[in-house]
Amino acid sequence: MTYRTTYEIQAVEIAVHLFGRFAFVSLFFFVILQIDNLANCIMTITELIQGQGTAFSFEVLPPKKGEGIEELERTVETLLPYGPKYINITTHHSEPVYKRLDNGLVEVEMVRRRPGTVAVAAALQYKYNIPIVPHILCSGFTKEETEYVLLDLQFLGISNVLLLRGDRNPNDAMFRAEPDGHQHTTELQEQVNRFNEGFFVNGDPIPSPGVPFSYGVAGYPEKHDEAPNIETDIAWFKKKVTGGATYGVTQMFFDNSKYFTFVERVRQEGIDVPIIPGIKPITSQKQLTSIPRSFHCDIPEEFTREMMKAETKEAQFQVGVEWAVAQCKELMRAGVPSIHFYTTGQARSVNEVAKQIY
């Protein structure tokens, strides 16, 4: 209350001194609105999704290296009318890029195709006054680099993050952490927890600790592709929750029964945090194979048949939208607290789905 009162008094003094009564009233309400927006940005995700109805959120990708932010802003502005409670932004580690040299040899260079997550997160949060949730990865980052990310985010007033292991290098059979990096999300959680407690990764105390981070983790209704079975995967999810995660957000799925079964089994383990379903509209026949290959999820036969009947690109798009709408309506009837949409850089399909359910 003191925080708000201080700003109100300053607004009154400036307005009366410079502009008189009309400006005083206008500026007073402007300041109140901005402080309310600021309050939203420092709320946790579990606080933001509380209340009646099913909350809306979505994920975006940072621009490719060398590209501008305008296309990303258009994606955000397309989906703003549906009142997103927060927006996730992905983080990308370096990937191998192969270049053929003049002598016929091949050179391998590690390149981050989409840098700038922290800067873009700050730009979006302060432009749109919506909480932004950057992803923090084990993959491709050392503990010290992770610490720098946490410090940068804290300076920028971003206190919600999603902690993930991240994908393995495509050339590796198994995930390999960076030297002095984290092998598992649970190890990354331990670092964030210690940071929240006021300690750097080397054990030194942080002179001026900031607002502690609140974080979520991933859940896999069809199990993580490296898990030997669903029981093992749920045990890992439970470990992440007991380690400090306040919510889970699932990998995309296309059969709601997989989500409902996952939630039921998780609840049987005594886990009561919100589990937010992740939805991605499939909008082309090509995605029937590319999405399972990339995200290790099944596509129902009924949906596959309908998609294969569609002869034009627009017809395929509509089949995918209709399936996602049906998924969302069933999830909403079941009382899910929120639905999280994966845009993968394309807002049109999510816009068409949201238009019909929000």
Regions found by a protein language model. Name each.
Residues 85-115, 168-179, 246-259, 344-346:
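Glycine-rich, proline-tolerant flexible connector loops at the mouths of alpha/beta enzymes
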Residues 59, 87, 153, 240, ...:
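Conserved, mostly hydrophobic/aromatic
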Residues 143-190:
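Flexible, glycine-rich active-site loops centered on histidine and acidic residues
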Residues 143-152, 261-264, 284-286, 349:
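Catalytic cores of alpha/beta
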Residues 41-58, 200-212:
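N-terminal amphipathic alpha-helix/helix-capping segment at the start of soluble metabolic enzymes
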Residues 75-90, 242:
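Catalytic domains of carbohydrate-active enzymes, especially glycoside hydrolases
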Residues 166, 179-212, 217-226, 264, ...:
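Active-site pocket-lining/capping segments in soluble small-molecule metabolic enzymes
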Residues 57-71, 133-144, 214-232, 309-322:
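Active-site mouth loops of central-metabolism enzymes
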